[in-house]
Regions:
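N-terminal first-folded block
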Residues: 6-36, 40-44
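Residues at secondary-structure transition points
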Residues: 1, 13, 20, 51, ...
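Non-catalytic surface loops within mature trypsin-like serine protease
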Residues: 14-16, 62, 96-98
Length: 105
């Protein structure tokens, strides 16, 4: 398989009452992340049925771009801002892109 985009889904469950603070910190992080050269897409999703659950969909040009993201000041600020809001450790699953072709992004 040729090199492909790295797609990461980060699943988060926040403590009751932490929804708005998590949303605000995550929106700021997502906006800054979208300006990184190795980021193709960076989405924040809220569960329709459970206001305490969120998913971050992060799409990077490479694993190196994902690693570089974790070295940015905005990621560090987000990580620190949301640490006490987490009801449980966040979980991430990594995928490779199959379709559409990477050039279609």
């Amino acid at each position: 398989m040729a090199a492909s985009l790295l797609v990461v889904h980060v699943h988060v469950r926040v403590k009751p009452g932490g929804e708005e603070a998590f949303r605000a910190a995550s929106l700021a992080n997502a906006g800054a992340s979208r300006r990184e050269p190795g980021v193709v897409r960076f989405d924040l999703l809220a569960d329709r049925d459970d206001p305490l659950r969120f998913v971050l969909v992060e799409i990077y040009r490479s694993a190196a771009a994902a690693a570089a993201h974790k070295e940015t000041p905005h990621y560090a600020a987000w990580r620190d801002a949301v640490a006490d809001l987490m009801a449980e450790p966040r979980r991430s699953t990594k995928y490779v892109n199959l379709s559409p072709d990477d050039a279609g992004w």
